[in-house]
Amino acid sequence: CALSYVAVGLTAFDAIVHAFTTVSTGGFSNYDSSFGHFSGAVEYVAIIFMIMAALPFVRYVQLVNGNSRAIISDTQIKTFLITTLLVATFVFFVLNNLFPGDWESALRKSLFNITSIISGTGYSSDNYMAWGGMLVSVIFFIGLIGGCAGSTTCSVKVFRYQLVASAILLQLRKIRYPH
């Protein structure tokens, strides 16, 4: 992670500080403006490593031990990635309509900030309050999701939401087909 940050222009000190807080999903920065202080390339690197930090560590162990399907076959990971992508896409379209003309910036800001919030990392690259009440509400609610169980992320975790959804579906089937 630190080497990737250096490759896109961070100093060694900034790269190490931000690598530690990205991989641990700790999210603190040595700058008041957090990732708003850096160029867009740094945000893309952070997106990749925040996603990696939000995945279950046991899947990485399985991957290293030769199970190449460990990550792609996990429903929790699929749910996390799809949720992140869907919410970031929604935020992108809203941002692109609010601030037309710079679609790359809208895409980067939506991916970075949504990944940061859903993973619990807490970095920011923009002032969310300028995005309007609807997107602030979206950010609040995705913060309640969190990453995958078995990762360093905070919040409820995707796995627990999957368990609740399964239990609800099971009960609904029992109500509909009692015998």
Question: What do the predicted segments below correspond to?
Answer:
Residues 1-179:
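Membrane-proximal intracellular helices of multi-pass ion channels
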